[in-house]
């Protein structure tokens, strides 16, 4: 894993300075066309967005490990049940943080973490997918930067969405682990997750509802700009046993 990759991983979890605006797209995406009550915006104690997550149970949120590593519960303020990053829904409190033991600052493997909330929230959680393979149609959602260069613009207030798909792992060249990660396409060669989207959900349609298949992790290459190649997502399918163990009553 190169030093540049680790720097990019860290940058994905920082707020892009500037006032939030309703700019269209994740990068190349659009405003959410439906409620995604399970999508969680993660804010610092001062209220700034730094990552996202997905509500998988009334008291549990899954996010990226690099969003939670080194933080205390008081450092994270989750807002649930709304497509608006700044209002609506319910602001929860974090009681505990569980970072996957495979993750450390020198290696992006195991980029998944769990946040235990102090009390159940009203928003409906999302179920976990049981399979993921190249060719699977997916959707990514988030409040991250909508232009590809770091600090090139403000963040959207409205949740963004982008339809994409899982592709062959050979298209992700930045330390990709095919046993525990998903390589996800950048449609048109210029759209995908960006700074501020880290930890957010990659979802798959299952009938009339959605299932969580991945967690936004990092770029699939070493480029300093977003969406110039497919992106890497932590596979929720691969970590389902770990999630079940840590969240059991």
Sequence positions of predicted segments:
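Secretory targeting and sorting signals
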Residues: 1-22
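C-terminal subregion of chymotrypsin/trypsin-like serine protease catalytic domains
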Residues: 2-5, 40, 54-68, 76-77, ...
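Cleaved targeting-peptide boundary
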Residues: 22-28
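Active-site region of chymotrypsin-like
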Residues: 34-49, 120-125, 160-199, 206-225
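A conserved glycine-rich beta-strand in the N-terminal activation segment of trypsin-fold
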Residues: 39-58, 89, 107
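Active-site-proximal beta-strand/loop segments in catalytic clefts of secreted hydrolases
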Residues: 42-45, 55-58, 64-67, 80-83, ...
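Conserved H-D interstitial segment of serine endopeptidase catalytic domains
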Residues: 42-43, 61-64, 69-102, 169
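Chymotrypsin/trypsin-fold serine protease catalytic domain
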Residues: 84, 92, 97, 109-189, ...
């Amino acid at each position: 894993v190169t030093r540049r990759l680790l720097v990019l991983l860290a940058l994905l979890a920082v707020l892009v300075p500037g006032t939030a605006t309703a700019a269209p797209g994740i990068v190349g995406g659009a405003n959410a066309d439906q409620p995604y009550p399970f999508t969680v915006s993660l804010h610092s104690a001062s209220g700034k967005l730094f990552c996202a997550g997905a509500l998988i149970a009334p008291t549990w949120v899954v996010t990226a490990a690099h969003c939670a590593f080194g933080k205390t519960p008081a450092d994270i303020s989750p807002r649930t049940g709304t497509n608006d990053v700044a209002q609506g829904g319910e602001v929860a409190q974090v009681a505990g943080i569980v970072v996957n033991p495979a993750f450390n600052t020198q290696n992006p493997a195991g980029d998944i973490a769990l946040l235990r909330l102090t009390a159940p929230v009203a928003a409906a959680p999302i179920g976990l997918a049981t399979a993921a393979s190249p060719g699977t149609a997916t959707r990514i959602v988030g409040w991250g930067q909508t232009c590809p260069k770091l600090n090139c613009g403000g963040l959207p207030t409205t949740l963004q969405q982008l339809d994409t798909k899982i592709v062959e792992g050979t298209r992700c060249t930045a330390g990709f682990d095919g046993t525990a990660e998903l390589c996800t396409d950048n449609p048109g060669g210029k759209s995908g997750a960006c700074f501020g989207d880290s930890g957010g959900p990659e979802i798959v349609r299952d009938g009339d509802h959605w299932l969580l298949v991945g967690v936004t992790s990092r770029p699939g290459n070493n480029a300093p700009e977003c969406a110039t190649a497919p992106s890497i997502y932590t596979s929720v399918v691969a970590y389902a046993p770990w999630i079940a163990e840590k969240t059991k009553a």
